[in-house]
Amino acid sequence: MRKSKINKRRSKPITSFKGRGPIARKVIATAKAHLEKKVIDFANWKVGKLNAQALEASVIDHNELADFDLAHGAYVYAQNKMSVLIEQIIELPEVQKLAYAYDELMADYTPAYPPMSSITVSYFTSWATSDLVTQGAKKESLASIAVDFCRYMQVDSSLLNLYENLEQSRMGIYRHEGSDTQFVHLTELITNRKIKALRTTDYLGNVGELWFVRVLPPPFDAAHMGHHVVFTTPYVFVPNRNYDSVDKSIEEQWLVCFERIFPTLTVDTPVQAYEHFMRHGLSRNYWLEFIFLSYINHEDGAIF
């Protein structure tokens, strides 16, 4: 794989960092206690016997990454590496509630690809690590806990930057504005954010479609690689003929839906309401149920 300069937004290690939430602080405190005892192998810092070598072997190798666009490959590698860390963290008693929720939802929705399941692996993995959060004022996710631990451990800033982008990502509803060989041009509803994003499936799409996808920001400084990445298989919305406004386009139907939902959320602006809704829905399982119940059809690279 060719080398590219990765944005080193966080160049200073945070040696005194204690974590943003109570779970992360407990995880870091436990790690600190073991590190002070000179137990420096993280594989030994756990409850039970964790096979760190076997987990590390599951990370995608550089030969496989050579087939990816550089930006996409960077995120695939980062997600694989972060998954290894999460697989170890999830065994700790401090993370028990999130771990239980993760396992329960995995069993209930059995992510795969239609016709086996409309919940794709790419969707569920990102949702369960970044959007599934604890209750209370300090909402923590598996990704946020992993990122906080990496900040404390002074993980390489380039890799940490990718971890942070994964953690902070969310789904969004985008209007298809046209596509070419590699890229799709999208405009997000409500935020009106216009982006050029790498397509990561063979589905070209059609102008005017609405895509429900997780789009990641450019990871590189280089201008010629400054494109976003569509990180999940597109869910393509089609008009709801049972909707009470059947004369409206699918976009108009969603805008009416937003008008009804946003006032019920305790946020200040429509953009904040939209971002909250995209990440958390109206309940923990809201978007999983939405995808499960809304499934109509699929083709290679897109689900309707």
Predicted regions, residues:
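Short aromatic-glycine-enriched beta-strand elements
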Residues: 182-186
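Short nucleic-acid-contacting surface segments enriched for D/E, G, S/T with interspersed K/R
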Residues: 198-214
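Short, structured beta-strand/loop micro-motifs enriched in basic residues and often containing a Trp
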Residues: 188-197
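Mixed-charge, low-complexity intrinsically disordered regions
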Residues: 1-172, 204, 217-304
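Conserved hydrophobic positions within beta-strands
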Residues: 176-178
